């Protein structure tokens, strides 16, 4: 089962009262959330946008992450993933067709010691640089907001995997506009300690296609993690919409040793 703890703190403005009220709600989510097939979740919409999956293999030995990008415009579809050190970056498949590199050219994956950072934008660099200065994942993301691509205001989604001394944990974050209102940024972090074998979580930018595109809602989806790296990679790629999928990155990390293997799939070849 999953336990979710939500803490809300209300502060009264200075000068009126020094009172504050704190409420804590602990809720057992077992009856409210069911684990679903990742394949079915991926194939259920034509345009989830960009997505991050993090979890653990069925044998419990490997930490898993996947990151995919999709596109509707020629500029968005004109991309490939390429290796960049221990991570990856996006680059234009045909440089002559690149119109606007902002928001589409970035490093989705970087490695900082025993931490693997996966995001849908240049906040990868923000997390890397500020965590390297001893700030936390959440503190780093406090300096960022959703993307300025009105009217969509695409959420910034991020994940971090921590492997140390045979232990594995991860966290996911989403920064999004306040129900389409860019005046406010809503910030959510979901932390998962001691991940269970054969399970993971999936977060993506959009609930589906639309105009404007509807931002992701709720908690990251609780999903099955199945197969070896090639089987998992094939399953994800095959269940993304054929017209809109662009690139996929998958990494399996040995929790005992920290060694990893990766796969990259690009539609543009």
Regions found by a protein language model. Give the residues of each.
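Conserved short alpha-helical segments that host acidic/polar catalytic motifs at enzyme active sites
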Residues: 30-269
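Generic detector of N-terminal low-structure segments
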Residues: 12-13, 28
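Aromatic (phenylalanine/tyrosine) cluster motif
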Residues: 1, 10-11
């Amino acid at each position: 089962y999953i336990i979710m703890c939500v803490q809300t703190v209300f502060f009264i403005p200075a000068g009126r009262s020094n009172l504050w009220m704190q409420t804590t709600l602990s809720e057992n989510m077992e009856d409210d959330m069911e684990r679903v097939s990742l394949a079915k979740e991926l194939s259920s919409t034509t345009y989830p946008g960009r997505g991050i999956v993090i979890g653990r293999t069925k044998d419990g030995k490997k930490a898993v992450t996947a990151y995919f990008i999709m596109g509707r415009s020629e500029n968005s579809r004109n991309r490939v993933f390429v290796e960049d050190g221990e991570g990856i970056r996006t680059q234009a498949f045909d440089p002559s067709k690149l119109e606007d590199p902002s928001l589409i050219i970035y490093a989705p994956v970087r490695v900082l010691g025993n931490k693997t950072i996966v995001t849908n934008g240049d906040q990868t660099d923000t997390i890397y640089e500020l965590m390297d200065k001893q700030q936390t994942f959440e503190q780093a993301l406090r300096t960022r907001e959703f993307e300025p691509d009105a009217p969509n205001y695409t959420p910034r989604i991020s994940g971090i995997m921590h492997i140390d001394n045979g232990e594995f944990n991860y966290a996911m974050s989403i920064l999004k506009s306040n129900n389409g209102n860019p005046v406010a940024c809503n910030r959510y972090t979901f932390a998962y300690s001691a991940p269970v074998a054969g399970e993971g979580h999936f977060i993506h930018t959009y609930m589906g296609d639309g105009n404007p595109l509807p931002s992701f809602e709720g908690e990251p989806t609780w999903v099955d993690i199945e197969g070896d790296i090639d089987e998992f990679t094939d399953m994800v790629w095959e269940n993304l919409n054929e017209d809109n999928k662009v690139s996929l990155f998958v990494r399996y990390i040995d929790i005992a040793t920290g060694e990893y293997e990766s796969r990259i799939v690009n539609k543009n070849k």
